[in-house]
Amino acid sequence: MIQPQTHLNVADNSGARELMCIRIIGASNRRYAHIGDVIVAVIKEAVPNMPLERSEVIRAVIVRTCKELKRDNGMIIRYDDNAAVVIDQEGNPKGTRVFGAIARELRQLSFTKIVSLAPEVL
């Protein structure tokens, strides 16, 4: 469960390393974000000499959470970290690579480009 002020790792090569959630896109009063939700975040740590810089406000989609994700078939998935992929206004990833495993639910939420870049889909 991701809420405002939560720090997340970045799972792509866009130039950001760490994000902090400042808003959850969707209903006006949503408290938590889960896998597949789009958030507004600020970059807390960035790689030098890259297009994205520290303190820049961006959008990101959550791809991994420490909180368990329960599927309809009873399977429970839990990751070791909270991670997100930086996206643009159209929902396309800004990076060209995605690191680590991501959940299959992203394909159903029309983030197919992120799924195709991922090395492993659980």
From Swiss-Prot:
Q: Supply the Pfam families for this chain.
A: Ribosomal_L14 (PF00238)
- Native species: Platanus occidentalis (Sycamore)
Which protein family is it in?
A: Belongs to the universal ribosomal protein uL14 family.
Q: What is this protein called?
A: Large ribosomal subunit protein uL14c
Record-level GO BP terms: translation
- Cellular component terms, GO, for this chain's entry? chloroplast; cytosolic large ribosomal subunit
Which NCBIfam families does the record cross-reference, listed alphabetically? rplN_bact
- HAMAP family recorded for this chain? Ribosomal_uL14
Location of the protein in the cell:
Plastid, Chloroplast
Q: Which residues form a coiled coil?
A: none
Where does this protein chiefly localize?
plastid
State its role. Binds to 23S rRNA.
